[in-house]
Amino acid sequence: MGGTFDPIHHGHLVVASEVASRFCLDEVIFVPTGRPPHKKEVSDPWHRYLMAVIATASNQRFSVSKIDIERTGPTFTVDTLRELREQLPSSDLFFITGTDALARIFSWKDADTLWSLAHFVAVSRPGHEVVDIPNDRISFLEVPAMAISSSNCRERVRSGLPIWYLVPEGVVQYIAKHGLYRSLYG
């Protein structure tokens, strides 16, 4: 499951759990992006990685990969999937993404190659519909509605509002300890 995870929140965890259950996945690997080319301001990759580790620690089916944050330069999904395919040649790879991200998939680097590297699972998010993508390339899954977004969590911290129950407790503590999101970007 790729994402910025800035910060990771309960919505991400519910999606991962639902997809793992629906598709009988042995493991869900969370892959925090290193330097996403489409986002200018993101927290340090290692902060995002550690928050993902904290958030997923209690679920044995979840793990977190450093694959993207150890790569230099911009992070592209196609490069990540190629590297995972090399590391896990006999595994069926599923790429979990939101329908909002999927709406932009044809603008991604080497978009036509993505379909041969993994099966895509698009999870519905409120207000985002995807059209003009062949259904044989993607499985669509509706999960329980959770109106949580990372950008809203960051804004709440910046405004001095609580994020308890939006993100795992350990992540709340990590954000406070490291002073993340207190300024416009920090």
UniProtKB/Swiss-Prot annotation:
Q: Which Pfam families match?
A: CTP_transf_like (PF01467)
Please name the InterPro entries in this protein's record. Answer: Cyt_trans-like (IPR004821), NadD/NMNAT (IPR005248), Rossmann-like_a/b/a_fold (IPR014729)
Q: Does the keyword ATP-binding apply?
A: yes
Write down the EC number: 2.7.7.18
Enumerate the UniProt keywords alphabetically.
ATP-binding, NAD, Nucleotide-binding, Nucleotidyltransferase, Pyridine nucleotide biosynthesis, Transferase
- Which pathway does this polypeptide act in? Cofactor biosynthesis; NAD(+) biosynthesis; deamido-NAD(+) from nicotinate D-ribonucleotide: step 1/1
Is Membrane a UniProt keyword of this protein? no
What is the reaction catalyzed? Answer: nicotinate beta-D-ribonucleotide + ATP + H(+) = deamido-NAD(+) + diphosphate
**Which superkingdom, per the lineage?**
Bacteria
**What is one GO biological process annotated to this record?**
NAD biosynthetic process
Recall the GO molecular function terms of this protein's record. Answer: ATP binding; nicotinate-nucleotide adenylyltransferase activity
Signal peptide positions (record)? none
**Matches recorded under PANTHER family:** NICOTINATE-NUCLEOTIDE ADENYLYLTRANSFERASE-RELATED, PHOSPHOPANTETHEINE ADENYLYLTRANSFERASE
In the record, the note on similarity to other proteins reads: Belongs to the NadD family.
Q: What does this protein do?
A: Catalyzes the reversible adenylation of nicotinate mononucleotide (NaMN) to nicotinic acid adenine dinucleotide (NaAD).
Instruction: Output the NCBIfam families linked to this UniProt entry.
Output: cyt_tran_rel (TIGR00125), nicotinate (nicotinamide) nucleotide adenylyltransferase (TIGR00482), PRK00071.1-3 (NF000840)
- State the protein's name: Probable nicotinate-nucleotide adenylyltransferase
